[in-house]
């Protein structure tokens, strides 16, 4: 049996040749034929652009994310955290949980309930009203923020990895794991699409050697195929991972073990139905 990809490739090739033939035949004809040629030219350009994108993703080579050294058994511990932007409107009270070395831990809850805020508390960007956060001595954190603060937006992708220690060949191969190819690396960050910036930021974290990752909505701006590729890259990560996401397909492929529900503070084993509930709930809120 022929593979589906092979069949699609042959059909696309036939369509491409057909469009080229029509364009060549009609391009110098009367106005009606010239318009037909222009229409087919647009279809051909769309077909070729989609072909390039598929080829780009098919060239993906999986990269193993290494850690510099393991953390202690409890890399991060949150004890009786209470926080709110005003004391009259608290996001959570007496929130307590430990991260266990090597686990993938998910935070879920309605939009605006304080998921991103919790990561900022752990990173000491914000200060709790009460309680404490203990980061063990050997915990090396890689933090993916939605703002992409790690990136120098005036420099190229390649220049943002100038301290990586990789040769040009190694860097190109590594960035291929995040779907960057050929001359992509010479693009400045400030001209990249939101999805491309996300991939650069995730690549920076993957190369950092961190043994504990905090990922805040890492699939925002990524198309479904790219989300699966990123999940495939991070699922074999041997460190500890704390993720904020309601993207069911992404977290399901990531291999989440436990979940924290906000604002209740309830901790439970991974349940895809709970993630689906919040995914649908937040989609509905975003529409209104």
Tell where the protein language model's regions lie, with residue ranges:
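ABC ATP-binding cassette signature C-motif
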Residues: 1-5, 64, 68-288
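Extended, highly charged alpha-helical segments
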Residues: 1-61, 166, 260-288
